[in-house]
Amino acid sequence: MGTIADDILDDLHGRILKTLDQLRTELAAVRTGRASLHLLDNVRVDYYGTPTPLNQVATLSVPEARLIVVKPWEKSMIPPIEKAIRDGNLGLNPMSDKDLVRVPIPALTEERRKEIVKQVKHKGEEHKIAVRNVRREAKELIEVAEKDGDISGDDAEKALEKMQKETDEGVKKIDEIVAAKEKDVLQV
């Protein structure tokens, strides 16, 4: 197969892996009823006028299954940290002590679990669409290269087959990631 086709397939592979990583990252921030530092990954704290990731202004730990402890490096950061977590649309209610913030993780209701599963499935679908869009773009590049005579018809056919296989594997992996997260959320 021609190097152009190989380059296109390598790019496709890399972009599918990136999509899978992005899905894992997004799903790590989804609440499951147990404490996880990833829950607070998207929380931004107002640090002297700049929205800053929480883990850049404090140390986070999980001492118990349903508790996250946030220990700011500066005591003056306690009120903004509390506000950022409360405003983070995570359904969490932080409480401050003199030098740290405790974030109890409430148990999820059955209704809330089902809602979260819906969100998880939706994120999975969005990422499947992203994978298919990557395949479509790569397919167009192969077709243009074939039309321009840069690769032969046989090489184009082989590349399209490999592309489809790669896409199917990516979609299957997304299904596996979503199923694992679903199981995690529904587990009481």
Swiss-Prot record:
It is found in: Cytoplasm. SUPFAM superfamilies: Ribosome recycling factor, RRF. It comes from the Bacteria. One of its GO terms (biological process) is cytoplasmic translational termination. Pfam families: RRF (PF01765). One of its GO terms (cellular component) is cytosol. CDD domains: RRF. Keywords: Cytoplasm, Protein biosynthesis. GO terms for molecular function: ribosomal large subunit binding. Responsible for the release of ribosomes from messenger RNA at the termination of protein biosynthesis. May increase the efficiency of translation by recycling ribosomes from one round of translation to another. Belongs to the RRF family. PANTHER family: MITOCHONDRIAL RIBOSOME RECYCLING FACTOR PSEUDO 1, RIBOSOME RECYCLING FACTOR. HAMAP family: RRF. This is Ribosome-recycling factor.
